[in-house]
Curated annotation (Swiss-Prot):
MORN repeats lie at residues 8-30, 31-53, 54-75. The gene is MORN5. It is found in: Cell projection, Cilium, Flagellum. SUPFAM superfamilies: Histone H3 K4-specific methyltransferase SET7/9 N-terminal domain (SSF82185). Expressed in sperm (at protein level). This is MORN repeat-containing protein 5. Keywords: Cell projection, Cilium, Flagellum, Repeat. Gene3D superfamilies: Histone H3 K4-specific methyltransferase SET7/9 N-terminal domain. GO terms for cellular component: sperm flagellum. InterPro entries: MORN (IPR003409), Morn5 (IPR042814).
Amino acid sequence: MEYTGSKYIGEYVDGRMEGKAKYILPTETIYVGEMKDGMFHGEGTLYFPSGSQYDAIWENGLAIKGTYTFSDGLHYDEKNWHYCDGYDRRFYTEILNGLKPAGMAQLTNMDPPRKIPKGYYDCGDGFYNPVTRVVKDYRNRFLRNADDDEHEWITRTCRKG
């Protein structure tokens, strides 16, 4: 574990991570749930540093069924996703709290919006640097490297500083 920067607190069977566990990844994402042969297996939840979470049924390390909940309580629905689509452009906070008066536009779900560093994009869970193709959370901690599809989506869709 010390080699990867991860931490495991849980049961072992024959020297392998198995049973109920808490697994802390180097990104500070935390898995709480069942393990089998060193993999997520059974019911378990990933808790992300942003405050969002993914509850799933896992099979040999792969999520076979799950639900994602954003930090503001919005649930992602793969089949009937109508949040901020072509028909209803309201942010979740506007759905919960109503629209602002005319002339007081809301630019992001967070109001007032975060200040974006020059040349970066706000991609919802952090700031994206298009030169390094790295997304860091709002506390400047590494989240991920963006692939070509995510890079294209962010630069086409997200607010730029």
